[in-house]
Amino acid sequence: MAGLKQNEDYDNYVVNICPNDTEGEVLTIGGLDIQLPKAPKKKEILFYDRKPAMQMWERLPVPAELQRIRSMDEWYEMPSDFKKRFSPYIEKEFDRRRNGVWFYNNGVPVYITGRHYMLLQWSKMDIGYASYLEFQRRLFIHFAACETDPRSIGQMYTKCRRSGYTNMSAAILVDEGTQVKDKLLGIQSKTGKDAQENIFMKKVVPMFKSYPFFFKPIQDGTTNPRMELAFREPSKRITKKNKTSNKGEALNTIINWKNTTNNAYDGEKLHILYLDEAGKWERPTDIREAWRIEKTCLIVGRRIVGKALVGSTVNPMDKGGNQYKEIWRDSDPEDRNANGRTKTGLYRLFVPAYEALEGFFDKHGNPIVEDPEHPIQTIDGDYVDIGAKTYLKNERDALKHDARELNEFIRQFPFTVDEAMRDSIEGSTFNIGKIYEQVEHNQELYPNPVVVGNFQWKDGVKDKEVVFSPNPQGRWRVAWMPPNELRNKYVIKYNKKHPGNDHIGVGGVDSYDLDSTTDNRGSKGACHLYNKFSMAAPPNMFVAEYASRPPLARIFYEDVLMASVFYGYPLLIENNKYGIVRYFESRGYEEYVMKRPEHLKTPGSINTKTRGIPSNSQDVIQAHAHAIEAYIEEHVGVNNETGEMGKMYFDRTLEDWIGYKIDNRTKFDLTISSGLALLAAQRVKKEKKQSNFDDKKFFRRYTKEIRR
């Protein structure tokens, strides 16, 4: 039987999808290791007798005699020799439907699942029959693994525009719905109208009508249903000659659609659920809440009894995209709970746009990604001399001076998941166009200028010397470190340590007070270190980033303290949570915590000894946002005056800036700390009025200052 298998070459379970339990090649798709059936003998593979260049998918011929038969009733009325002649053909089609098909494609034996075969061979659409495309083969294989894996509730596919996922999902619904008994298969989309007209009436019903008679179960209702496709015995009037019903022959299975509400199928037991355009469900519907409710329709106790197809391009974050993004985050097959499931139960999958772009498939259905040496004939009969990647890059280059249009194009045809999850520029607090310019630049940098690691006391001796230790699992990300002579530099004034490099840089901290063992809300401690304008170090640059939540708050405090000591930078700390300030004071480092800068004090306010800065002041909130806004305009992305690229290398912070909402700041820890660092860098020292003491006499006074 197909299912989970142990394989010595793989650390995790391999999902074997062969109905006959043979073991063939293993593909890794979307982080899932999937084992295909073992390839059969050469002569059992379609198109084996053709030259490699002529080996490609083609629909198999259907006997003309069978095409004239419309129902099983007509079949039963045919002569026995007729049925004997064509029964092997019908049995072979059922075998292909169950076990899948092997065919030669340009000299390579290729396996397609039974559901994929049903799409290609038997599912006619308004544009005719589907072409074989390699990326869709992988989608079908991935879904077969989701169906086979007892830990999975289904597939989540983040896609580019026009990738054919609706056709694929409709084909799966019809294929499964015409085989199983007493089941319900459901459809929802971003609106009820979309579910009814664009999927059910334009896809599902025509595909079913195109099936040959031997795949069509008994159907109740009209030939063009609008609400449901019901495979049950039609109602009959009871007469003297008809006192019984043959309902046992019917499947009693239904494919239907429902309006877009969070609980549309609540209380139902679903066999397959297709959630179309799940990244575009807008309020009052919420795809997170809908999935929380409706996945229970696919589970009975601990058993998963149904599967889901969830696919979409992604709307702007405030129009359903953020909720979809959260489901995506929790659907990583490499992040499972103790029961072996992802948090959502789904397995996510992404295909870059350049592997799924219309017009860029050769006649064998393989994507033309890179530029070919010679023009290549496409599956449409045209010739192309560039690859899909170059084509899309050319389109991007043409829009580089229109940030809004460029951003929308990238969102619709993404190369990466991050691009697919991009937010719309409209209504954003900051210039997202420039932020994305920086993100794209950072992705192309090699080697990566950011090093991950931890700061620690040398040899474990506190308050002596801090060193940095690279560690892939570290909590700090560092893009620049001071030269040896500037590290751990401090000044003793009035018997207290003061940071020795405050003329070079500063830091900002968004803290928390409660240990994670008592506070599970997920807010992280965040810190940024920033170089001001100076000749001693790269200016106007964030040099270190921290975003973590150790189990104990004091671990976070010590992490920040050590970094501050190492760089010799003072910190501006949000003082609504005062625990970190007390910690610095208890360790003798209170002078490493800045007081509220003079230019951010409320006019007429009384001076206070409290260190840090409140985050609930509207003046501070506005100044904080303006500081980040100005920094992005001047130092992020391409500088419009010089043409130079910014040196902001921390992608987590860039992504945090993208989503930042000034009226809902709570969850944007990195935005808070980075803005505080920029406010600290703005600190202005007021010049004191000089007095004339020529006629005054004073005792001589000595000051003691020791520099280390």
Kindly give the residue locations of the regions a language model identified:
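N-terminal accessory segments
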Residues: M1-I153, K202-M207, Y211-P212, N224, ...
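RNase H-like, metal-dependent nuclease domains and their acidic two-metal-ion catalytic environment used
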Residues: A2-N12, N16-E23, L27-G31, R232-I254, ...
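Walker A/P-loop
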Residues: P150-L173
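Alpha-helical scaffold elements adjacent to nucleotide-binding pockets in ATP/GTP-utilizing enzyme cores
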Residues: I172, N198-M207, K269, E289-E294, ...
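Post-Walker A helix-loop "phosphate-sensing" segment adjacent to the P-loop in P-loop NTPases
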Residues: E176-K183
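Conserved nucleotide-state-sensing and coupling region of NTP-binding domains
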Residues: L184-T261, L309, E440, E444-V452
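Short, conserved "post-DEAD/DEAH" coupling segment immediately C-terminal to helicase motif II
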Residues: T285-R303
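Short alpha-helix plus adjacent loop in nuclease-associated cores
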Residues: V593-V638
